[in-house]
């Protein structure tokens, strides 16, 4: 089990439902916001449970081939509306298609052969200019006292 405040090196293997990167250190699963598949990161454990924990991204040691320099939207890391904006747009589409397909196979028990016949590729937005990023309509702004 990891300890709170421990600094670890993690290779990100998947992305969770909230857009957080998922990696393992000695079999222990960590969820790391702003990390994407293929990144090797240095992270600080913020919350440690028995079998998993949450960590804060400290440094990207080796960026994924799909990582962008900076998210297009200056509010991306603050508003919570575009969780995987650190990822290039074509990679976002491929990830989303893979996630839907995996859920249909695993949860819906739809055979892969059937999905090959009926499932179409994810349709993205027009990539001219900034169009892939002008259709979102969700924002989460935390407030406190």
Q: Where are the regions that the model predicts?
A:
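SAM-dependent transferase fold signal centered on methyltransferase-like domains
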Residues: 1-145
